[in-house]
Amino acid sequence: MHIDARLEEASSNLTYLDILLRFCKNLKIPDDVENSVTEALLLILFIWAESPFYSTKRNMEILCQALSSQIIEQCKEYIKLDVALGNNPEMGIQMLEKCIFCCNVYRSIYDNVMVNVTCYINLNRQWDINQQEVFSKINIFQQRCYDVIEICKALIVFGRDAKIGLIGGPNGTEYEAYLREIQSLFYENLNEIITARDIVFDVTRSIWFIKIKQFRYMDLQLENMVVNLINDIFKNIKNIEEGVEAIYALQKFKERENLRELLQKKWIQVWKIFSSEIEYCYINAINQSRKETDIGVNLLCILRYLRNQYSIVTNALDWIGDCDFGNCVLQRYEHVVDVIDERRKMFNIYSTNATQYL
Protein backbone atom coordinates (compact mmCIF):
# COMPACT_ATOMS: atom_id res chain seq x y z
CA MET A 1 0.00 0.00 0.00
CA HIS A 2 2.86 2.34 0.85
CA ILE A 3 4.57 1.55 -2.49
CA ASP A 4 1.36 2.23 -4.42
CA ALA A 5 1.03 5.64 -2.76
CA ARG A 6 4.61 6.49 -3.62
CA LEU A 7 4.10 5.43 -7.22
CA GLU A 8 0.96 7.51 -7.46
CA GLU A 9 2.81 10.54 -6.06
CA ALA A 10 5.74 10.06 -8.44
CA SER A 11 3.44 9.66 -11.43
CA SER A 12 1.51 12.78 -10.50
CA ASN A 13 4.67 14.82 -9.98
CA LEU A 14 6.13 13.69 -13.31
CA THR A 15 2.96 14.65 -15.14
CA TYR A 16 3.01 18.21 -13.84
CA LEU A 17 6.78 18.64 -14.11
CA ASP A 18 6.82 17.34 -17.68
CA ILE A 19 4.40 20.09 -18.68
CA LEU A 20 6.70 22.75 -17.23
CA LEU A 21 9.87 21.12 -18.56
CA ARG A 22 8.61 20.97 -22.14
CA PHE A 23 7.57 24.60 -21.98
CA CYS A 24 10.83 25.85 -20.45
CA LYS A 25 12.89 24.16 -23.16
CA ASN A 26 11.14 26.41 -25.68
CA LEU A 27 11.36 29.69 -23.79
CA LYS A 28 11.97 32.58 -26.18
CA ILE A 29 14.56 34.44 -24.12
CA PRO A 30 15.40 37.25 -24.42
CA ASP A 31 13.35 38.05 -27.56
CA ASP A 32 9.88 37.35 -26.15
CA VAL A 33 10.63 37.50 -22.46
CA GLU A 34 7.33 39.00 -21.36
CA ASN A 35 5.05 36.30 -22.79
CA SER A 36 7.48 33.45 -22.08
CA VAL A 37 8.03 34.35 -18.43
CA THR A 38 4.34 35.05 -17.80
CA GLU A 39 3.31 31.65 -19.16
CA ALA A 40 6.08 29.86 -17.24
CA LEU A 41 5.07 31.48 -13.94
CA LEU A 42 1.41 30.69 -14.56
CA LEU A 43 2.35 27.04 -15.14
CA ILE A 44 4.21 27.03 -11.81
CA LEU A 45 1.10 28.48 -10.15
CA PHE A 46 -0.98 25.82 -11.88
CA ILE A 47 1.23 23.13 -10.29
CA TRP A 48 1.02 24.94 -6.94
CA ALA A 49 -2.78 24.98 -7.14
CA GLU A 50 -3.52 21.59 -8.69
CA SER A 51 -0.74 19.16 -7.78
CA PRO A 52 -1.79 17.07 -4.77
CA PHE A 53 1.80 16.21 -3.86
CA TYR A 54 4.28 18.65 -5.39
CA SER A 55 2.79 21.96 -4.26
CA THR A 56 4.92 22.39 -1.14
CA LYS A 57 6.77 25.64 -0.40
CA ARG A 58 10.18 24.02 -0.92
CA ASN A 59 9.19 22.47 -4.25
CA MET A 60 7.78 25.77 -5.54
CA GLU A 61 10.99 27.49 -4.52
CA ILE A 62 12.99 24.89 -6.46
CA LEU A 63 10.80 25.38 -9.55
CA CYS A 64 11.22 29.15 -9.47
CA GLN A 65 14.97 28.79 -9.04
CA ALA A 66 15.01 26.39 -11.99
CA LEU A 67 13.16 28.96 -14.09
CA SER A 68 15.75 31.56 -13.11
CA SER A 69 18.53 29.19 -14.13
CA GLN A 70 16.85 28.48 -17.46
CA ILE A 71 16.52 32.20 -18.20
CA ILE A 72 20.21 32.66 -17.40
CA GLU A 73 21.20 29.77 -19.67
CA GLN A 74 19.25 31.15 -22.61
CA CYS A 75 20.71 34.62 -22.05
CA LYS A 76 24.20 33.09 -21.99
CA GLU A 77 23.51 31.44 -25.35
CA TYR A 78 22.32 34.78 -26.72
CA ILE A 79 25.44 36.69 -25.63
CA LYS A 80 28.34 36.27 -28.06
CA LEU A 81 31.45 36.93 -25.99
CA ASP A 82 33.66 36.59 -29.06
CA VAL A 83 31.84 39.56 -30.54
CA ALA A 84 31.66 41.58 -27.33
CA LEU A 85 35.35 41.15 -26.49
CA GLY A 86 36.45 41.15 -30.12
CA ASN A 87 35.82 43.52 -32.99
CA ASN A 88 32.34 44.76 -32.06
CA PRO A 89 32.07 45.74 -28.38
CA GLU A 90 29.16 48.08 -29.22
CA MET A 91 27.07 45.12 -30.37
CA GLY A 92 28.22 43.25 -27.28
CA ILE A 93 26.92 46.04 -25.08
CA GLN A 94 23.55 45.88 -26.84
CA MET A 95 23.31 42.12 -26.24
CA LEU A 96 24.26 42.48 -22.58
CA GLU A 97 21.83 45.33 -21.99
CA LYS A 98 19.06 43.28 -23.59
CA CYS A 99 19.75 40.43 -21.16
CA ILE A 100 19.80 42.81 -18.19
CA PHE A 101 16.45 44.17 -19.38
CA CYS A 102 15.16 40.61 -19.74
CA CYS A 103 16.03 39.86 -16.10
CA ASN A 104 14.35 43.06 -14.95
CA VAL A 105 11.20 42.12 -16.86
CA TYR A 106 11.26 38.67 -15.28
CA ARG A 107 11.49 40.18 -11.80
CA SER A 108 8.69 42.66 -12.53
CA ILE A 109 6.36 39.97 -13.92
CA TYR A 110 7.10 37.69 -10.97
CA ASP A 111 6.13 40.45 -8.53
CA ASN A 112 2.98 41.25 -10.47
CA VAL A 113 1.83 37.65 -10.89
CA MET A 114 2.55 36.55 -7.35
CA VAL A 115 0.81 39.57 -5.84
CA ASN A 116 -2.19 39.87 -8.15
CA VAL A 117 -2.85 36.26 -9.20
CA THR A 118 -2.14 34.00 -6.23
CA CYS A 119 -4.83 35.61 -4.10
CA TYR A 120 -7.49 34.56 -6.63
CA ILE A 121 -6.29 30.96 -6.92
CA ASN A 122 -6.75 29.91 -3.31
CA LEU A 123 -7.87 32.27 -0.59
CA ASN A 124 -6.77 29.80 2.07
CA ARG A 125 -3.15 29.57 0.88
CA GLN A 126 -0.40 32.15 0.76
CA TRP A 127 2.49 32.30 -1.70
CA ASP A 128 5.31 32.69 0.81
CA ILE A 129 8.31 31.71 -1.33
CA ASN A 130 11.64 33.32 -0.42
CA GLN A 131 12.06 35.81 -3.26
CA GLN A 132 15.71 36.39 -2.44
CA GLU A 133 16.41 32.71 -3.11
CA VAL A 134 14.50 32.85 -6.39
CA PHE A 135 16.50 35.78 -7.75
CA SER A 136 19.91 35.28 -6.14
CA LYS A 137 21.43 33.83 -9.33
CA ILE A 138 19.63 36.39 -11.48
CA ASN A 139 21.18 39.20 -9.44
CA ILE A 140 24.66 37.69 -9.84
CA PHE A 141 24.14 37.19 -13.57
CA GLN A 142 23.03 40.78 -14.05
CA GLN A 143 26.11 42.03 -12.22
CA ARG A 144 28.29 39.86 -14.48
CA CYS A 145 26.59 41.51 -17.47
CA TYR A 146 27.42 44.93 -16.05
CA ASP A 147 31.01 43.78 -15.55
CA VAL A 148 31.33 42.72 -19.19
CA ILE A 149 29.74 46.00 -20.35
CA GLU A 150 32.46 47.76 -18.37
CA ILE A 151 35.08 45.68 -20.19
CA CYS A 152 33.48 46.43 -23.58
CA LYS A 153 33.57 50.16 -22.86
CA ALA A 154 37.23 49.88 -21.90
CA LEU A 155 37.86 48.09 -25.21
CA ILE A 156 36.25 50.98 -27.09
CA VAL A 157 38.49 53.47 -25.29
CA PHE A 158 41.83 51.68 -25.08
CA GLY A 159 41.67 49.11 -27.85
CA ARG A 160 41.71 49.29 -31.65
CA ASP A 161 43.85 51.53 -33.82
CA ALA A 162 44.22 55.11 -32.61
CA LYS A 163 44.40 58.26 -34.71
CA ILE A 164 47.18 59.66 -32.59
CA GLY A 165 49.29 60.15 -35.74
CA LEU A 166 47.17 63.22 -36.56
CA ILE A 167 49.00 65.13 -33.84
CA GLY A 168 51.76 67.18 -35.41
CA GLY A 169 54.91 68.56 -33.93
CA PRO A 170 58.30 67.04 -33.19
CA ASN A 171 56.90 64.72 -30.48
CA GLY A 172 54.12 63.19 -32.59
CA THR A 173 55.97 59.90 -33.14
CA GLU A 174 56.78 59.66 -29.43
CA TYR A 175 53.14 60.18 -28.49
CA GLU A 176 52.05 57.53 -30.97
CA ALA A 177 54.51 55.01 -29.52
CA TYR A 178 53.25 55.76 -26.00
CA LEU A 179 49.67 55.15 -27.09
CA ARG A 180 50.66 51.85 -28.70
CA GLU A 181 52.18 50.84 -25.39
CA ILE A 182 48.90 51.66 -23.62
CA GLN A 183 47.01 49.65 -26.22
CA SER A 184 49.35 46.67 -25.84
CA LEU A 185 48.99 46.70 -22.05
CA PHE A 186 45.22 46.84 -22.42
CA TYR A 187 45.13 43.75 -24.62
CA GLU A 188 47.30 41.89 -22.13
CA ASN A 189 44.69 42.77 -19.51
CA LEU A 190 41.82 41.81 -21.82
CA ASN A 191 43.42 38.45 -22.63
CA GLU A 192 43.26 37.56 -18.94
CA ILE A 193 39.48 37.95 -19.18
CA ILE A 194 39.22 36.05 -22.47
CA THR A 195 41.23 33.19 -20.98
CA ALA A 196 38.71 33.03 -18.12
CA ARG A 197 35.68 33.28 -20.41
CA ASP A 198 34.18 30.02 -19.09
CA ILE A 199 33.66 31.52 -15.63
CA VAL A 200 32.36 34.94 -16.72
CA PHE A 201 28.69 33.95 -16.54
CA ASP A 202 29.09 30.97 -14.22
CA VAL A 203 27.15 32.35 -11.26
CA THR A 204 28.45 29.56 -9.03
CA ARG A 205 32.12 30.58 -9.46
CA SER A 206 33.19 33.41 -7.16
CA ILE A 207 36.69 33.50 -8.65
CA TRP A 208 35.27 35.96 -11.19
CA PHE A 209 35.38 38.67 -8.51
CA ILE A 210 39.17 38.33 -8.43
CA LYS A 211 39.40 38.51 -12.22
CA ILE A 212 37.28 41.64 -12.57
CA LYS A 213 39.07 43.30 -9.65
CA GLN A 214 42.42 42.72 -11.38
CA PHE A 215 41.02 44.05 -14.65
CA ARG A 216 39.72 47.22 -13.00
CA TYR A 217 43.04 47.87 -11.28
CA MET A 218 44.94 47.67 -14.57
CA ASP A 219 42.22 49.67 -16.32
CA LEU A 220 42.74 52.49 -13.83
CA GLN A 221 46.49 52.41 -14.45
CA LEU A 222 45.89 52.75 -18.18
CA GLU A 223 43.57 55.68 -17.59
CA ASN A 224 46.29 57.40 -15.57
CA MET A 225 48.73 56.79 -18.42
CA VAL A 226 46.35 58.48 -20.85
CA VAL A 227 45.95 61.41 -18.45
CA ASN A 228 49.73 61.83 -18.44
CA LEU A 229 49.80 61.57 -22.24
CA ILE A 230 47.12 64.25 -22.70
CA ASN A 231 48.79 66.59 -20.23
CA ASP A 232 52.15 66.11 -21.93
CA ILE A 233 50.70 66.78 -25.38
CA PHE A 234 49.08 70.02 -24.28
CA LYS A 235 52.22 71.29 -22.57
CA ASN A 236 53.58 71.77 -26.09
CA ILE A 237 50.44 73.20 -27.70
CA LYS A 238 51.16 76.79 -28.74
CA ASN A 239 48.40 77.65 -31.19
CA ILE A 240 44.73 76.98 -31.86
CA GLU A 241 45.24 74.69 -34.84
CA GLU A 242 47.55 72.33 -32.95
CA GLY A 243 45.12 72.24 -30.02
CA VAL A 244 42.11 71.38 -32.17
CA GLU A 245 44.07 68.69 -34.05
CA ALA A 246 45.19 67.15 -30.75
CA ILE A 247 41.65 67.04 -29.35
CA TYR A 248 40.41 65.50 -32.59
CA ALA A 249 43.09 62.81 -32.42
CA LEU A 250 42.11 62.03 -28.81
CA GLN A 251 38.34 62.00 -29.39
CA LYS A 252 37.82 58.33 -28.53
CA PHE A 253 38.95 59.00 -24.96
CA LYS A 254 35.81 61.10 -24.46
CA GLU A 255 34.01 57.79 -23.89
CA ARG A 256 35.62 57.71 -20.44
CA GLU A 257 34.14 60.26 -18.00
CA ASN A 258 37.39 61.32 -16.32
CA LEU A 259 39.16 61.66 -19.66
CA ARG A 260 36.20 63.55 -21.12
CA GLU A 261 36.47 66.09 -18.30
CA LEU A 262 40.21 66.42 -18.90
CA LEU A 263 39.72 66.96 -22.65
CA GLN A 264 37.10 69.58 -21.86
CA LYS A 265 39.71 71.43 -19.79
CA LYS A 266 42.12 71.21 -22.72
CA TRP A 267 39.39 72.63 -24.95
CA ILE A 268 39.19 75.58 -22.57
CA GLN A 269 42.97 75.86 -22.87
CA VAL A 270 42.54 76.24 -26.65
CA TRP A 271 39.96 78.96 -26.07
CA LYS A 272 42.42 80.74 -23.79
CA ILE A 273 44.98 80.69 -26.60
CA PHE A 274 42.36 82.22 -28.89
CA SER A 275 41.55 84.82 -26.23
CA SER A 276 45.22 85.76 -26.00
CA GLU A 277 45.40 86.04 -29.79
CA ILE A 278 42.39 88.36 -29.77
CA GLU A 279 43.94 90.64 -27.15
CA TYR A 280 47.31 90.67 -28.91
CA CYS A 281 45.67 91.61 -32.21
CA TYR A 282 43.56 94.25 -30.51
CA ILE A 283 46.57 95.94 -28.90
CA ASN A 284 48.50 95.70 -32.15
CA ALA A 285 45.65 97.32 -34.07
CA ILE A 286 45.18 100.10 -31.53
CA ASN A 287 48.90 100.90 -31.61
CA GLN A 288 48.92 101.32 -35.38
CA SER A 289 50.00 104.92 -36.11
CA ARG A 290 48.63 107.22 -38.77
CA LYS A 291 52.20 107.86 -39.83
CA GLU A 292 52.47 104.30 -41.11
CA THR A 293 51.70 104.27 -44.82
CA ASP A 294 50.49 100.66 -44.87
CA ILE A 295 48.24 100.83 -41.81
CA GLY A 296 45.15 99.83 -43.81
CA VAL A 297 46.90 96.73 -45.10
CA ASN A 298 48.15 95.89 -41.59
CA LEU A 299 44.68 96.14 -40.11
CA LEU A 300 43.22 94.05 -42.92
CA CYS A 301 45.84 91.34 -42.27
CA ILE A 302 44.99 91.38 -38.56
CA LEU A 303 41.28 90.97 -39.38
CA ARG A 304 41.94 88.10 -41.76
CA TYR A 305 44.13 86.36 -39.20
CA LEU A 306 41.50 86.66 -36.46
CA ARG A 307 38.74 85.46 -38.77
CA ASN A 308 40.84 82.46 -39.74
CA GLN A 309 41.39 81.59 -36.06
CA TYR A 310 37.69 82.10 -35.43
CA SER A 311 36.86 79.71 -38.27
CA ILE A 312 39.10 77.00 -36.81
CA VAL A 313 37.54 77.07 -33.33
CA THR A 314 33.93 77.46 -34.48
CA ASN A 315 34.24 74.58 -36.97
CA ALA A 316 35.37 72.42 -34.06
CA LEU A 317 32.27 73.29 -32.01
CA ASP A 318 30.16 70.74 -33.91
CA TRP A 319 32.17 67.77 -32.66
CA ILE A 320 33.80 69.09 -29.47
CA GLY A 321 30.92 71.15 -28.11
CA ASP A 322 30.80 74.63 -26.66
CA CYS A 323 31.70 75.88 -23.20
CA ASP A 324 30.86 78.96 -21.13
CA PHE A 325 34.37 80.36 -21.40
CA GLY A 326 34.28 79.93 -25.17
CA ASN A 327 31.03 81.89 -25.39
CA CYS A 328 32.66 84.78 -23.53
CA VAL A 329 35.66 84.67 -25.88
CA LEU A 330 33.34 84.79 -28.91
CA GLN A 331 31.65 87.89 -27.54
CA ARG A 332 35.04 89.53 -27.09
CA TYR A 333 36.01 88.46 -30.61
CA GLU A 334 32.95 90.12 -32.14
CA HIS A 335 33.70 93.35 -30.29
CA VAL A 336 37.39 93.41 -31.23
CA VAL A 337 36.70 92.61 -34.89
CA ASP A 338 34.16 95.45 -35.05
CA VAL A 339 36.63 97.88 -33.47
CA ILE A 340 39.48 96.90 -35.80
CA ASP A 341 37.22 97.02 -38.86
CA GLU A 342 35.94 100.49 -37.93
CA ARG A 343 39.50 101.63 -37.34
CA ARG A 344 40.54 100.25 -40.73
CA LYS A 345 37.68 102.10 -42.46
CA MET A 346 38.57 105.29 -40.60
CA PHE A 347 42.20 105.15 -41.71
CA ASN A 348 41.14 104.40 -45.28
CA ILE A 349 39.00 107.55 -45.29
CA TYR A 350 41.80 109.55 -43.69
CA SER A 351 44.28 108.24 -46.24
CA THR A 352 41.94 109.05 -49.15
CA ASN A 353 41.29 112.59 -47.92
CA ALA A 354 44.98 113.22 -47.28
CA THR A 355 45.82 112.10 -50.80
CA GLN A 356 43.29 114.54 -52.27
CA TYR A 357 45.06 117.52 -50.66
CA LEU A 358 48.49 116.53 -51.94
Regions found by a protein language model. Give the residues of each.
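Extended, acidic/polar low-complexity N-terminal regions with helical/coil propensity
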Residues: M1-L358
